[in-house]
Amino acid sequence: MKTSDTSARPVSPPIEGRTGGVSYFTIPELTSSATAQREGIDNCPPKCAYHLLHVLVDQLLDPIREAWGEPIVVSSGYRCKELNALVGGVKNSHHMLGCAADLIAGNKADHRRLFKLIQQMQQEGKIRFTQLIWGGAKGAPLATTEGLSSQRSVACDSNGRWIHISYVPSDLRCQVIGE
């Protein structure tokens, strides 16, 4: 995947959510893609993916952001099939379902702290997820698992770090890869 500059990506302040709670993320944040814009790709999610993006926010992103207490940038959320292929995503990517987000949380220490916080929240029964993946520098070897490449890069912070998290309602295995 291509590394993108996330400095221009919007970071949402809290807004009133759909379920009466607070939502820190918007659907436009989760579907925005500089690559799609540049390449003229329509990255609008179908209705089923739109619904799953709301589930992702409600079940994972908002609780994580609330516990974190600071802004978290979504560097990659929903990807249509064409965009996913263009950026080098795996063929069975949860991003194409609207079930995944790649997160950026500052420097390496912040990333490590956020990754550990997400694990702690899962261990305490506060959240469940499908996969939590520690992403390394562009082109750096990552932990290999079924469906993941061992040489993969994604939209990341200036130091090449990202955290992938997914929520597939029928597959909450809480798989942790890396760190």
Model-identified regions with their sequence ranges:
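Catalytic cores and adjacent binding grooves of peptidoglycan-active enzymes
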Residues: 4, 105-179
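Amphipathic alpha-helical interface surfaces
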Residues: 56-60, 83, 99, 110, ...
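Extended, low-complexity, intrinsically disordered C-terminal regulatory tails
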Residues: 58-88
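A broad, low-specificity signal marking well-ordered, structured residues that form hydrophobic/aromatic
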Residues: 72, 101, 163
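Catalytic micro-motifs at enzyme active sites that drive phosphoryl/nucleotidyl and oxygen chemistry
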Residues: 88-93, 151-155
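Acidic, His- and aromatic-enriched active-site or binding-groove loops in soluble protein domains
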Residues: 91-113
